[in-house]
Amino acid sequence: AAAVLAYAEHIENPSVLAKALEHITTKHVSLDIQPEQYAIVGENLLHSISEVLDVAMDSDLIAAWQAAYMQLADLMISMEKNKYQTLASQHGGWTGWRAFKISAIERSGSAYLFSVTAQDGQAILSAQANTPISVRVSVPEQELLQPQQFKLSASTENSYQFLVECVAEPSPYSVAAILAQHYDVGDVLELSAPMTV
């Protein structure tokens, strides 16, 4: 909602928002956000605006907000498309989710250092420490896949390491807690490509 408001304030000169849009689209690509998801978010956002402002969904005000949202969505979809293409074209790059096998887990207190290798044995994208990466796991007892972003601790030509820190009372959907409590060496999880673009 904040991004839509900022966009509406700078609709005549969206380049003012370039840094913020770069950050948002990088996170979206890491989480594998797809163009069709923008329509769902937009519909929910417009309903929220309608409720908060107590105006009908078919009002001119909501139509104006919808137009601003769609312009912003189109801009972000275009930026994300370029990022996906760049990631896929790099040596070892990919888009979407890729299966990785856990090769080692080192524990230190409430922190876990996971080492993973690509299950398909193919090359992986070279990345530096602190590069954002998303990990997606199955939520126990739910038919749900949940992603969470982490930062790479290290990478080699065929493996990544990322640090998972657990909190005392995690949500049942916390990827960090699920990894710590339910995943072991040899298990498979999914990663998005490190956000090197």
Name what the model sees in each region:
Residues A193-V197:
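A short, basic/flexible loop-to-alpha-helix module at the beginning of a structural domain
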Residues L189-L191:
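Structural and coupling elements of P-loop NTPases
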Residues Q90-D187:
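Ferredoxin-reductase
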